Amino acid sequence: MARINIPVFLTILWISTCHLTRAKHLSHVSSLRSTISFKDCQNFKKKDLMKRNMKSQYESTSWGWNTKSKEKEMFEQSAWYLIVRESVSNLPVAFSHFRFDIDFHYEVLYVYEIQVEEDYRGKSIGKFIMETLERLCIQSKMEKIILTVFKQNQGARRFFREVMEFKLDESSPADTSEEHFDYEILSKKYG
């Protein structure tokens, strides 16, 4: 495992208390969450980081960018957050928005977002986040970890395929002569 070049520690935010009642394998994971309130979570401004990092990517696809829709998605009851903070200032430098879900009959940890502040890129924080999510996936007895990546985002595709060893998921849509998809679905299976 690569070492992170800056001192950081991890906080997992849990947005909703009703989520554990719906996920049979997750009762032992609740000890990982902090007591940070929903208000503190909103004050983190992760939506601003996500907008800075991803707005232009979305705008160049058929999906387009919709701020209200993205904010709604990020604050749904099923949302979990892994937040990396600098240990000296306690300021957030990266986050991942993820969910425990059922996807085509598989119990999965679905990574919705992984965002790193520009000044902290290239310091193995993304790899640290993904390795942490993989361990959480295994500990929670999920069958796979899954994510969606834009095809135009070559850096992200290279990171997930080459560094993290994700494969094209069987649910990923294939381009045809009539239809082109702006994204692909990648996954890594466990168990």
In which residue ranges do the predicted regions lie?
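Acetyl-CoA-dependent GNAT
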Residues: 45-112, 117-118, 130, 135-136, ...
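Short glycine/proline-centered loop/turn elements that form peptide/ligand docking sites
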Residues: 130, 152-156, 173-179
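Conserved N-terminal entry element of GNAT/NAT acetyltransferase domains
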Residues: 1-45
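Conserved GNAT acetyl-CoA-binding A-motif
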Residues: 138-148
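Conserved acetyl-CoA-binding loop-helix of GNAT-fold acetyltransferases
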Residues: 122-135, 162
